[in-house]
Structures are given as structure tokens and as C-alpha cells.
């Protein structure tokens, strides 16, 4: 029996979560624990929701003028350190618009990956979906990094680029990333 991407995704959800409560609009699931929607999480969620339409354009030009090509080089180097291979299960925490997916090694077939991206900003996820929907099998979830809706030990790769500075509880977010990673995975 062949499982759909949605079925594969739902198999990863913690058992104490009512699947019916994973609201979604058909493109993006939602699991926002209101307990974590305070402090920096709330502030930056609102900011990134407002910036989402222009984010990639602004990052490209401001980043280029301010940092040269170093941001792209950093992303490319980061992706080299992860153990990419076709067919694995991947979680990208704070996926934003998905720009970093451009730096996954070219020998990896993006459509072969069981790929999940989470972000606290629904606006950024909408932008990510519009850019990546035809190029990947990407499931997007609007949730806080401090309360991931996934079972323990389900992802071969869990990665995050830069947004941790904006989390309300950085230590808890890191613990969550470790919890959902398979033993021996690089984070």
C-alpha cells in the first residue's frame, strides 16, 4: 500500500494530539500552542507575518550590500555538514520562505525527501508554499519550535538556520529538536 504525503505526516504526530485539532487550510497545518505565543515568539511572529511578502527580496539586496555573498556561502556550507540522501525524513525548524532549500546538495532529489517545515509565522509559510509546492513534497506546519507536534525519534535530519535568536525559550526549542531527531542524527 502506498501512503500519501499527508498520511506519512500524520504518522509522525504525537499520540496525545487530536488530529482533528491540526487545523489546516489544505496547504499548511496549524498547531499553535497558545502557551508559547508570548514574548519574542509573539513579537517576531507578527513582524515576520508583515514582512513575508517582501522578505526574500529584502534579504537578497540588504544581505548582498551588507554582507556580500557570505550569507549564501554560509548556507551552502551548513548544508554540506548534514547527511543528505534520497528518501530520508527531514524537519526544518523555522523554515521561513524556504530559501535555504536552494542549498541542499544537487545530488539529492528534493521530491524524494519526506520533508516537513515548521515556522511560527503563517505569512512566511504561505510564501514558502507558493515558492516550493511544485519542487518538493513539503509539508508545512504553523507551530512554535518550543512545542513540536511530532513523536520522538522520527526525523533523520533536523536543522535550523538563524531564527533561534528570536525564540522565547531557546533551550526548550533545542530540546525539542533533539527529541524529534532519530538517535545519532546531526542537528
Predicted regions and their residues:
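Short N-terminal helix/helix-N-cap motif within the alpha/beta-hydrolase-1
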Residues: 123, 168-171
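A short acidic, Gly/Pro-enriched loop at the edge of an enzyme's catalytic core
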Residues: 146-157
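A short SAM/SAH-binding and catalytic strip from SAM-dependent methyltransferases
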Residues: 157-169
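A short glycine-rich, Lys/Arg-flanked "PGG" loop and its adjoining helix->strand segment in the class I
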Residues: 171-183
Amino acid at each position: 500500500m502506498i501512503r500519501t504525503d499527508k498520511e506519512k505526516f500524520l504518522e509522525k504526530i504525537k499520540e496525545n494530539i487530536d488530529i482533528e485539532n491540526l487545523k489546516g487550510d489544505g496547504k499548511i497545518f496549524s498547531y499553535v500552542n497558545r502557551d508559547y505565543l508570548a514574548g519574542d515568539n509573539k513579537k517576531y511572529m507578527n513582524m515576520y507575518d508583515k514582512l513575508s511578502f517582501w522578505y526574500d527580496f529584502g534579504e537578497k539586496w540588504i544581505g548582498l550590500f551588507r554582507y556580500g555573498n557570505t550569507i549564501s556561502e554560509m548556507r551552502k556550507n551548513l548544508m554540506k555538514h548534514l547527511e543528505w540522501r534520497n528518501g530520508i525524513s527531514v524537519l526544518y525548524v523555522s523554515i521561513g520562505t524556504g530559501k535555504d532549500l536552494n542549498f541542499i546538495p544537487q545530488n539529492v532529489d528534493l521530491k524524494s525527501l519526506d520533508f516537513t517545515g515548521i515556522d511560527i509565522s503563517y505569512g512566511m509559510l504561505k510564501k514558502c508554499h507558493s515558492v516550493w509546492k511544485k519542487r518538493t513534497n513539503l509539508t508545512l506546519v504553523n507551530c512554535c519550535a518550543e512545542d513540536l507536534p511530532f513523536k520522538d525519534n522520527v526525523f533523520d535530519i533536523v536543522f535550523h538556520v538563524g531564527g533561534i535568536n528570536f525564540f522565547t525559550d531557546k533551550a526548550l526549542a533545542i530540546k525539542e529538536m533533539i527529541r524529534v531527531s532519530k538517535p545519532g542524527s546531526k542537528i
